[in-house]
Amino acid sequence: MGKSRGDKYRDATDGKKDAKKDLNELKQELAMDEHQISLDELYARLGTNPDTGLTSEQAKTRLDRDGPNALTPPKTTPEWVKFCKNMFGGFSLLLWIGAVLCFIAHGIPCWCAGEPYLYDNLYLGIVLAAVVVITGCFSYYQESKSSKIMESFAKLVPQYAVVIRGGQRIDAPAEALVVGDIIDVKFGDRVPADIRVIKASSFKVDNSALTGESEPQTRTAEYTNENPLETKNLAFFSTNAVEGTCRGVVVATGDRTVMGRIANLASGLEMGATPIAREIAHFIHIITGVAVFLGVTFFIIAFILGYYWLDAVIFLIGIIVANVPEGLLATVTVCLTLTAKRMASKNCLVKNLEAVETLGSTSTICSDKTGTLTQNRMTVAHMWFDNKIFEADTSDDQSTANYSRASSTWMALSRIAMLCNRAEFKPGEETNPVLKRECNGDASESALLKCVGLSIGGVTGYRTDKPKVAEIPFNSTNKYQVSVHQTDDGDERYLVVMKGAPERILDRCSTVLMEGQELHMDDQWRESFNNAYLELGGIGERVLGFCDLRLPADKFPRGFKFDIDEPNFPIEGMPFVGLMSMIDPPRAAVPDAVSKCRSAGIKVVMVTGDHPITAKAIAKGVGIISDGNKTVEDIAAERGVPVSQVNPREASACVVHGSDLRDMTPAQIDEILENHSEIVFARTSPQQKLIIVEGIQRMGAIVAVTGDGVNDSPALKKADIGVAMGITGSDVSKQAADMILLDDNFASIVTGVEEGRIIFDNLKKSIAYTLTSNIPEITPFLIFILADVPLPLGTITILCIDLGTDMVPAISLAYEEAEDIMKRMPRDPFRDKLVNERLISMAYGQIGMIQASGGFFVYFVIMAENGFWPSRLLGLRKQWDSPAINDVADSYGQEWTYTQRKRLEYTCHTAFFASIVIVQWTDLLICKTRKNSIYQQGMWNHHLTFGLFFETTLAIFLSYCPGLEHGLRMMPLRWTWWLPVLPFSVSIFIFDEVRKKFLRTLPPGNWVERETNY
């Protein structure tokens, strides 16, 4: 039995509900307990053996059941669908309708009379169709170029993994891993699946792409947190192992991994229309409304005036088509493409042309911290020794060091940092500046290595001369690292060096090194230590303590066997040497970029997975939290009261912890967004980033989200515009984004915002310029119907304007320099439209009417010079257009044949065309600016100067080129017929300069602004 229609409908509805339900489930925090239960219980659940792993048969069965360990590729739009969207979407649809109407207008006389009266409508229909096809192909080509760049990015999935199968240690393709496999991961590998750690040796992973934490995270077999993303006994698919080794059991593969869930969350989100797409749709509604209104009105008038119904229908179609700005689709496409190219040269790759303008509409930027605002490179920022805090010198020549590099305490501190350190420079990096050298090892240890490499130099040789004989690696229980070294400095004693958490190091020290002297550790010194530790930790820096000790030669002679499992050498009673603190520093250009955003009315919100203290410190460093603005915690600390006693609305800044966000309702999130101007969200999960973006969008903001990690991809997809990082960004984030920063620099976004605002302004100018000539193109047709005069302007001539003389000048406005755009508030997408009633009023009702008046003046002048006074022209249409009448008398009684009349009519068409070109000169100049005088703006846009030259040259060519009187019905003009329209052109310039003077000088909100400022 087949399903009834009702059943099918219910199935479809249920499918949508299920999809929505699945998406809501993905938005929930991770629900898993594999990290909480004991290992034995986990082995039993997964049916595996920690020593022998799975058998080949078990692995094959599970692979068949669960599928390969790979992320399902995101659904891509078929190329033919992309092509059709460019061919039939938005503005193209209006032109297609125009083309169809032209074919109908051509076909009606053919159908009724057996042969067409004129081929104008056929030509117009063909040209309209050609315009759509050419611009559609052009847009498709631009988008496909961007997608090819996207396809060239590296693949995410690791290729091979070391797995225990049937007791054998083998290399297997990562895609063949299944739940229950026992795998080994070592330094340099990419974790091939979600694993529960069974045992680990100094194992650290870089989780920055997944959680946003800039420091490598230690992974051990112990369960430390109920949150799967924060516990130490889980390592996740596609994160990188940066130190040590680990054995683990696979608990999830493919789409069921944390990475897979996030990727599915991103691909499951629905994307709304871009602001520019909504603007173009709004514009089409306006143009269609005006066209249909005029068409129907004059159809009724023509009917009342006694026109035959067939003629009235052709009039109706003609007026609708005359309202269609044929060249505007090409103009908008080319303008967006030019801006996209300009942005690409400034390191912004636009995947979708419409995203160009969206960035300019942005009112809130949600930025990731690690790698976007910061350099994703841990750097030593401060040192504390000899009871003073010193700023680290990061200059290549060490010219800004404010401490003595010869200080014995500094030499001792740098010696420990060099020796108690597993990081090393990669081979072949010797010729590069120290700060730019690639390192193998932990990010913090690499920072120490570069710091002492800059200050002391020769790290590799120094280590060779002082070989390591024993080492206790750092672990999360002891929180320190110890190594024992032989030295070549004439001292036969072994040197023990130690670094770690400052409080743990302090516990193992009884004296302190001060200016080369070993002194007793008193309470005053301890207070200084605590103050320094709190100060450095309070600005978000990771602080490490350092100490060393010479072992007595009689007890520890050369060749002594050191035991690291149960140390047989002293690791207490050591002299404390100093502190060194590190931070992932902000990018140099970011503070200025944030300042520009603020002056442009754009709110910058930090959303990071990193620690709140670090996030707050970076936010203050880059200006997201301004100087003087305080959080609730700052106010409470100042007053010496609990945080609960401070009204949150007193604080303009706010740092929200992910654990607090988890328990908030949408209304509470909205309250935070409304009441705080400067916001930092820290320790957020990918699901929470998405919820934050949705909350900001609920406030009516247009949101741009920046990020490089997989954890950013759902938010990137949901945002009005997602901006991914090209260098450090994951493939998942690049797929989800609309734009890619090729240099990973937040400052490039501000460039993008500026370009987006410029293009919105310049598109307005182009549209205003293009629409204005619609009135002198439509009114001849209306007068032709109402006054029954010979047609002042032909259809073919209109095409010469729309697709000829107007095109290059309209496109040249895309190059116009900005007026105060980065000092304005972001545009309100609901009120500040690309085409609003004020623009229509200016283009159609004011400038357009002056242009039409100029055209009619020229028309009547030429007719009068040839004997037809205006009074004689009224009601003359039927006689004039009849091929059978060859004796139409003019005002002086001279008789005109049909051929003579048509030659005069085509001369009038050409003159009307020339007059439109001349008034469009001035229209182009006044469209250069929206408020500034042309004398303020200047004529520095050379493309516009070329546009003026081009349209004039083309008009002269079309008017005087032999043979065009047959193809385009263009007749040579007397030079005097170019002159009558000049006063109208000058009056347009004077009118608009006076209007702009009022806009600049009258108070904001004045009537001129309300009525004419588009």
Curated annotation (Swiss-Prot):
* Residues annotated as the enzyme's active site: D368
Q: Which GO terms describe its molecular function?
A: ATP binding; ATP hydrolysis activity; metal ion binding; P-type sodium:potassium-exchanging transporter activity
The answer, when asked if Metal-binding is one of the entry's keywords, is yes
The family database entries (CDD domains) matched by this protein are listed as: HAD_like, P-type_ATPase_Na-K_like
* Polar residues bias locations: 49-58
Catalytic reactions of this protein: K(+)(out) + Na(+)(in) + ATP + H2O = K(+)(in) + Na(+)(out) + ADP + phosphate + H(+)
- Which terms are listed as keywords in the entry? ATP-binding, Cell membrane, Ion transport, Magnesium, Membrane, Metal-binding, Nucleotide-binding, Phosphoprotein, Potassium, Potassium transport, Sodium, Sodium transport, Sodium/potassium transport, Translocase, Transmembrane, Transmembrane helix, Transport
One example of a Gene Ontology biological process annotation:
proton transmembrane transport
The annotated topology with respect to the bilayer is: Multi-pass membrane protein
Q: In which tissues is it expressed?
A: Preferentially localized in muscle cells and protonephridial ducts, and in small quantities in the tegument of cysticerci.
Lineage top rank: taxon? Eukaryota
Q: Any transmembrane segments, and where?
A: 124-144, 281-300, 313-330, 764-783, 794-814, 834-856, 909-928, 942-960, 976-996
Subcellular localization is given as: Cell membrane
The reply to whether Transmembrane figures as a keyword in the UniProt entry is yes
- Please state which protein family the record places this protein in: Belongs to the cation transport ATPase (P-type) (TC 3.A.3) family. Type IIC subfamily.
Q: Entry's PANTHER family?
A: SODIUM/POTASSIUM-TRANSPORTING ATPASE SUBUNIT ALPHA (PTHR43294), SODIUM_POTASSIUM-TRANSPORTING ATPASE SUBUNIT ALPHA (PTHR43294:SF13)
Protein name, please? Sodium/potassium-transporting ATPase subunit alpha
Annotated source species? Taenia solium
